[in-house]
């Protein structure tokens, strides 16, 4: 089995004296693990940081066994964010969420595009936290657990949608949800429209929303918690006053 594909590095760990096992999110083939010869070397290791954009040439003798990959870096990757530790935390958290949520060797082009959009936004400090929420919503969508924010689940109206049912992932209008608001999840307006700026608390509400469904539908059934990198990101965003 052989293919060449655009990819993002999700994780890498040393293997043997000089090699590395690398988790890749590829554009057309999904999440793949591969052995990279020399991946632990000073020359190659900088290209294998979480979030790095690469071209991967994958080869395996048997399709269901671990293959090898030759990696060619594309652009600066995480190095462009070295002066922004918070953005680097966002990139690491996104890589950890994707690595934990996506099944191996199953195409998920929507997840790749959502990750790509986030990496493009990370140099814009006022924008990327909201794009991170959209990335997680896109990941849920691509895995079959998309939020239905098109209309109120109770009445069918499309205006004044301010909550989401934690059970179904469907939007609820202010009037219909008022009696049950303590049991509903807040719906930040930026998930409904790209128009307008962020309000205080919108990013926190968005992360609580996507985090709930990632935990309920993806990580929980696998008996795994949300990745520590995501929890650290919330702490750092809070410390920076960015929630």
Swiss-Prot record:
- GO (cellular component) term, any one: bacterial nucleoid
Q: Does the keyword DNA repair apply?
A: yes
Keywords annotated in UniProt: DNA damage, DNA recombination, DNA repair
Key word Repressor present: no
Q: Which residues form a coiled coil?
A: none
Q: Which GO terms describe its biological process?
A: DNA recombination; double-strand break repair
Pfam families in the record: RecO_C, RecO_N
- Function as written in the Swiss-Prot or TrEMBL entry: Involved in DNA repair and RecF pathway recombination.
Similarity remark: Belongs to the RecO family.
The molecule here is called: DNA repair protein RecO
Q: Which organism is it from?
A: Phenylobacterium zucineum (strain HLK1)
This protein's gene is called recO
